[in-house]
Amino acid sequence: MKAGEGDTKMSRCSVDARNSRVTSRNLNVIELARRRKRGRMKYRQLGSTGIEVSLLGFGMWPIGGTQHAGDYGNVDDDAAVAAIHRALDLGVTLFDTAPAYGNGRAESILGTALGTRRRDSVVVTKCAVHWDYAKEQWVTTSNREAILASAEQSLQRLRTDYIDVLLIHVPDPEGSPAGSMAAFRELVDSGKVRAVGVSNFTTEQLDEYRQHGSIQVQQSGYNMLDRRTETKMVPYVSANDIGFMTYGSLCHGLFSGTWNSKTSFAAGDWRSKGDVFGLPLFLGENLAKNIEMANRLKEFAESRSHTLPQLAIAWVAMHDFVGTCLAGMITPAEVEDNVTGVDWSLAPAELQEIDRILAGAAGTEGADHYVVK
């Protein structure tokens, strides 16, 4: 070592260390400011993806409106965009959509709304389901070509060059796990997708697909009335470090706090058939009984200065195995109300009272998982 070289290196190291500390301190200030802006939102890691997500996720299905069979009622685009912006302001980072939601409409609205705020969001979308105009029905196709084509179309509608999480929407009875996983690998290797997973799968189907690659995320229905995933799916995803997204936190509107004895559904609304993902919660007399039960839960929540949606979200969010719990939202007011739910910690005595009220529900018996027909 030449004379003075050691001193020079030490000096350079000291400067580098000092700059590193300054940079770290600046980043901490930025991070604190960012979190203050987010308010009381909580965040969790989504399994092994390395992606941090808001505990409350924005469910985009209702925003798809009524385009084809299986959608919700009409939704105002401007209100939907305002709701997305408000969610971002309050710290919601995860947005869950799909080509099937309004036949691409929900993706397009999300892409428009995010704009320059795309970097503040985690976009989850899906593939393998499309509308067949000739047959006038939804078709499931999860072969390699279909997945690649669907992803490209989603990227265009979302106005982005990458998707954070891409899920197979529903199991394809005629699909090839090897072909699906090959498509996933191509998309990840190209940088168009960060993480991959599935939705509405059984543990047996997960086993089959995982023989051909890594499944990082599973999405299933889960709420106070639908606890079927607790039997097999929850232990499975926990044991295999698979990120668990739950949908239906508000039981598809039942826990919105707005239903009453006069509640009915439009002809194009999927809930009009009464079946809620394999449970007859809204069928015949069950609907009236469950609305009555929900109103008792509403009274319980209001006696504690909360709303029914906040109670429903708090109940799902309290479970450590949940990476993010989705709730459908179509207005800024709904966003503001729902966000508060993740900050409510339910006491043991409150949980016992909730279970007593839930005992009056109807149509909760079913298989230990939702079977896609």
List each language-model region with its residue ranges.
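N-terminal binding-site loop/beta-alpha segment at the start of enzyme catalytic domains
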Residues: 28-121
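Terminal-tail/helix-coil boundary detector
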Residues: 36-41, 81, 265-303, 318-323, ...
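Conserved, mostly hydrophobic/aromatic
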Residues: 46, 58, 80, 95, ...
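Aromatic-lined glycan-binding groove of carbohydrate-active enzymes
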Residues: 229-272
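Active-site beta-loop-alpha junctions enriched in small/polar residues
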Residues: 61-63, 98-100, 126-130, 168-171, ...
